[in-house]
Amino acid sequence: MYIDTSELCDIYLDQVDVVEPIFSSFGGVNRFYGKVTTVKCFENNGLITDILEENGEGRVLLIDGGGAVRRALVDAELAQLAVDNGWEGIIVYGAVRQIQQLEEMDIGIHALAPIPVGADKQNIGEIDVPVNFGGVTFFPEDYVYADLTGIILSQEPLELDEFNDA
């Protein structure tokens, strides 16, 4: 389904929060949206693996890595796991790696930066907790919308039918 965050802001500005423009797109899909699932972890991605093994249809994983860019929280293997399980997208407040492979995958991925160093594989962190970055607090069950222009957040799903009637 087509989305345009600029048009969504024109219509729903009073209902959405706009994430600060600190993210770049690294996935093969430029527009994505879905219900938020959150994980908070620092330089390890064991919990991320556990979450991405779940059915991700209609869901976007928000990863609060503390803004650290010393280790990549998402790589090609995890992104492929997300694709295989139907996730709509991943937003990483941290780093990703294996960018050439990520760009070929059928998933949206936004992150702060690339780095070649991988994360530890420990299951340390918290799942489904509020996370705050980019000037916005993300709650589990919120709805996030992302494209190349930006990322916006809503407590309720936004009506998208008018964008897809053309």
Swiss-Prot record:
Which GO MF terms does the UniProt record name?
endoribonuclease inhibitor activity; enzyme binding
Q: Which Pfam families match?
A: RraA-like
- Name the NCBIfam families on file: NOT-MenG (TIGR01935), PRK09372.1 (NF006875), RraA_entero (TIGR02998)
Q: What is this protein called?
A: Regulator of ribonuclease activity A
Localization per record: Cytoplasm
The main place the protein resides is cytoplasm
- According to its UniProt entry, this protein's organism is Pasteurella multocida (strain Pm70)
Q: Which gene encodes it?
A: rraA
Q: Is this entry keyworded GTP-binding?
A: no
**What cellular component GO annotations does this protein have?**
cytoplasm
Role played: Globally modulates RNA abundance by binding to RNase E (Rne) and regulating its endonucleolytic activity. Can modulate Rne action in a substrate-dependent manner by altering the composition of the degradosome. Modulates RNA-binding and helicase activities of the degradosome.
Q: Could you list this entry's UniProt keywords, alphabetically sorted.
A: Cytoplasm
| Protein family membership | Belongs to the RraA family.
Q: How does it assemble?
A: Homotrimer. Binds to both RNA-binding sites in the C-terminal region of Rne and to RhlB.
| Biological process terms in GO annotation | regulation of RNA metabolic process
Which InterPro entries does the protein's record reference?
Answer: RraA, RraA/RraA-like, RraA/RraA-like_sf, RraA_gpbac
